[in-house]
Amino acid sequence: MIYNIVIYFVLWGIAIASLFNEKVRKMWRGEREAFKILKQKVDPNAKYIWFHAASLGEFEQGRPLMERIRKDYPQYKILLTFYSPSGYEVRKNYEGADIICYMPVDTRLNAIRFLRLVRPVMAFFIKYEFWSNFLHILKYRNIPTYSVSSIFREDQVFFKWYGRSYAGVLKCFTRFFVQNEESKRLLEGIGITAVDVVGDTRFDRVLQIKEAAKHLPICEAFRTGVASSQSADVPHHDFKVF
């Protein structure tokens, strides 16, 4: 409840700031146009895998996995969303995704509308992306949802006595692929055990550029993680070679 009240205040703040700041104006316009883009481009007969990155740095962290999926599973389409203009404006013509747009503001209504329209079979949130309404509705709809290259610190609200209610947002994820052992320890401390330590996927991108990467650690962990976490309420998807 408090989160949703804050979101609406943030929404009004963005609207006002957009009158004076070009970057904020682009973000505000892009978020409002997201549904228009999706209505025009979503193929109702296709199966989409959704990647969300806040900005350019997070995009680079998710890019190795995105490109591996596109190569090995061409039957799936890729939807890529950004929060920041610094990501969207640079990568809006990226050929590795079928649809690219801003992520709508995290209201419950937007989340419901977005997921009904896209109907993703799987979702990946890169690093620090913990949007409560989207994540809770993804969980409600039994859509496997993964946090990639996430990293946690002990001073974050999730791990404080007063923030345990917000830690429920983290429990919406099917599995975490974290950067270090400390992040795994912190998550396990609040009862989240579906965690793999895979490092920073940006290093895979560097190796990929140098043509030295033959395997992506996150893909191997993903394959193992999905195999060990299948249950009756989690749809199975044919990602067998990860």
Task: Place the predicted regions along the sequence by residue.
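Membrane-interacting alpha-helical segments
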Residues: 2-6, 10-17, 21
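Active-site and donor-binding regions of nucleotide-sugar-utilizing enzymes
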Residues: 15, 19-212, 217, 224, ...
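Low-complexity, intrinsically disordered or signal/transmembrane-proximal segments
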Residues: 230, 236-237
